[in-house]
Structure formats: C-alpha cells, structure tokens
C-alpha cells in the first residue's frame, strides 16, 4: 500500500501554483473549470487552485469503468456544455479518454494535465465574497439528466460548519478522518474534505476502487491512523 502525505502548507503552495498555471492559460475570475480526476493528491491541488484564482471548479466523475464508454462520453460532454467550461483538468489515467469526450461538446474545451499546472509560478489568491459562487456540483442523474447546482462560499462553509457541530466539544479531542468516498461525490468532497480543512484535522483518503477490491484496507487505515470519523 503506497502512501502520499500532503501537509497544509504544501497544499497551500500547490494550489497557488495550479492557479498560476490556469491564469497563464487565460482562465479568469468567474470562469468554470471542469475537473475529471480519481482520488489522487492532485485533485485537491486543482480544486482549491481553481478557487484560489477566483474561478469556479466543476468536479465531474472520471471514467472508472471501461464499459458503456459511449454513454459516459455523451453525458460528460453534456455536463461540460451546461457548465460552460472551456478548460478540463485531468490526470494521465483519466486523460487518455477525455479527448473523445470533449469532441462531443458544443463548444471547444481544452484539456490540461494537473501535473503541468503544478509546475507554474504561483499567483496571489483572489479576493472572494460569501455570495460568490464557490463551485458547481451536478446532481447524480438517477431519475433524469444531471443538473448543475451553483453553491456559494457561504453555503459551503455553512454545510461544513454544520457537520463539525456534531463533533465532541472537548479540548482533548483530536479528530482524524478516514474515507473511501469519491471526491467528485458530495459526501467525499463536501462531507469530508471541507470539514477537515475547516476544523482543521488530518484526513486519510482511500481510492474507491482500492476499497472495493480490498475492503479491509479501510479497517487497516482506521487502525493505523486512529480514525474516529
């Protein structure tokens, strides 16, 4: 089992570099940037890098299965078009399939690897207001086509704060989270990442595919990192 550790200062520095890379591409404040990545450290770099720039991240689920790819490409292209994203950030694994997706979009979409953005010079953080849009989240599409929902910074922080309200009010309590929920999902991102940063607390992320292949990895991580959430 391979581990990658990222500290809060490292995350801050990496997000500033991602923001610099996006700015060099011409991404501006208020633009939407699609993110199609699995559970990897670069996901949070990119997500918060987009916010750092004052742009709006749009997390979309990656092609986790090779079956039904035609349906995946069509649905993802429709979401990219609805979100009006002209830039899609991905990694090497998911990026191999994104070319087919963007060709199905109504407007041009540029694909960029997260690894290239991390090499850019950092830029200062944009000044945002509580009513500014923080992210666009798509509904699951269980009963119809996925629909975009714009969430403001105030709404996201209120949700994270409400989750933290259930934590014990004890000075000696040191929370540590362990999750295998996907980061493009609201529970993985809003339910786990945001509260961990707001508290702040350590958080161990397990790729969903690793958990599905070996569920015991979750229990081992809970024991190893003393997870209580």
Range-by-range predicted roles:
Residues 119-138, 144-145, 150, 155, ...:
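Conserved pre-ATP/AMP-binding loop-to-beta segment of ANL
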Residues 1-48, 65-72, 127-128, 151-157:
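Conserved AMP-binding/adenylate-forming core of the ANL superfamily
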Residues 32-36, 51, 134, 176-178:
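Short, well-ordered beta-strand segments
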Residues 1-7, 134-136, 143:
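AMP-dependent adenylate-forming
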Residues 157-176, 186-228:
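Conserved AMP-binding/adenylation subdomain of ANL enzymes
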Residues 24-25, 52-121, 126:
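Structural core segment of the AMP-binding/adenylate-forming
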Residues 36-38, 89-94, 181:
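Structural motif
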Residues 19, 40-65, 73, 78-87, ...:
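A short helix-loop-beta submotif of the ANL/AMP-binding
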């Amino acid at each position: 089992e391979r581990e990658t550790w990222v500290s809060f200062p490292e995350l801050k520095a990496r997000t500033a570099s991602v923001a610099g890379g996006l700015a060099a591409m011409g991404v501006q404040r208020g633009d939407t940037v699609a993110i199609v990545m699995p559970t990897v450290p670069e996901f949070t770099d990119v997500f918060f890098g987009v916010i750092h720039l004052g742009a709006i991240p749009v997390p979309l689920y990656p092609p986790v299965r090779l079956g039904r790819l035609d349906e995946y490409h069509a649905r993802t292209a429709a979401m990219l078009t609805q979100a009006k994203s002209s830039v899609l950030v991905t990694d090497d694994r998911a990026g191999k399939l994104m070319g087919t997706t963007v060709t199905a979009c109504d407007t041009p979409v540029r694909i960029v690897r997260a690894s290239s953005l991390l090499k850019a010079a950092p830029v200062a953080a944009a000044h945002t207001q509580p009513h500014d849009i923080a992210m666009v989240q798509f509904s699951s599409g269980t009963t119809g086509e996925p629909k975009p929902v714009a969430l403001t910074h105030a709404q996201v922080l209120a949700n994270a704060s409400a989750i933290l309200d259930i934590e014990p009010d004890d000075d000696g309590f040191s929370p540590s989270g362990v999750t295998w929920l996907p980061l493009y999902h609201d529970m993985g991102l809003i339910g786990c990442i945001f509260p961990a940063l707001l508290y702040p607390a350590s958080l161990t992320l397990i790729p969903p595919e690793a958990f599905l292949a070996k569920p015991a990895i979750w229990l081992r991580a809970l024991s190893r990192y003393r997870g209580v959430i």
